Design a protein with these regions (language model features):
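Glycoside hydrolase catalytic-domain context in secreted enzymes
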Residues: 1-180
Length: 180
């Protein structure tokens, strides 16, 4: 009989609850790092969550590079951002699978991508403004949703998992918050 956490007919919540019940406290803690350790007794391989995709798959060899987010925002084109999210996810998945075949679970090989940056760029002194869609909350929301939907896909299984950057605290630099 298949373990409940492996049963694709169950909801993600049901599967996660079953898996969490099987893990020791130490095993649960080992999964909180970006470089999650394997849990051989449950068939869980090592996994590295650290990957970036703000404007294409970053630092993982050859990949399509798109303009910085602030430049993409200037298009006001949600369909374009959706397509860029799709392409980024497709390339990330291909790189993930190729690395996995070679037992490579290092940084920049996972399917959780730190993107998009949904912080609002309200202070020009902030050094990461180019990673955002600008200062307008409406535009940032529309473009962010389009990018995430493109990246994650419409299927039962996510193509890649978008992890929105910032939102509240990415403007924390050098020990203090920059106004913004």
């Amino acid at each position: 009989m298949m373990e409940r956490y492996l049963d694709p007919s169950l909801t993600p919540d049901e599967r996660a609850e079953d898996l969490a019940d099987r893990l020791t406290v130490e095993e649960q803690a080992s999964q909180l790092r970006y470089d999650a350790l394997p849990i051989p007794r449950l068939g869980i391989p090592a996994y590295n969550w650290w990957n970036e995709g703000l404007h294409g798959v970053a630092r993982a060899g050859t990949a399509t590079m798109f303009p910085q987010a602030i430049g993409m925002a200037a298009t006001f084109d949600t369909a374009l951002l959706h397509q860029i999210g799709e392409i980024t996810a497709t390339e990330a998945r291909a790189k993930h699978m190729a690395a996995r075949e070679h037992g490579d679970f290092d940084i920049y090989k996972g399917l959780t991508l730190w993107a998009p940056n949904i912080n609002l760029f309200r202070d020009p002194r902030w050094g990461r403004g180019h990673e955002t869609y600008g200062e307008d909350p409406f535009l940032t929301a529309r473009l962010g949703v389009a990018f995430v939907k493109g990246m994650q896909g419409e299927g039962k299984v996510l193509k890649a998992a978008a992890c929105g950057l910032g939102f509240a605290f990415l403007n924390y630099m050098d020990g203090e918050l920059t106004p913004g």
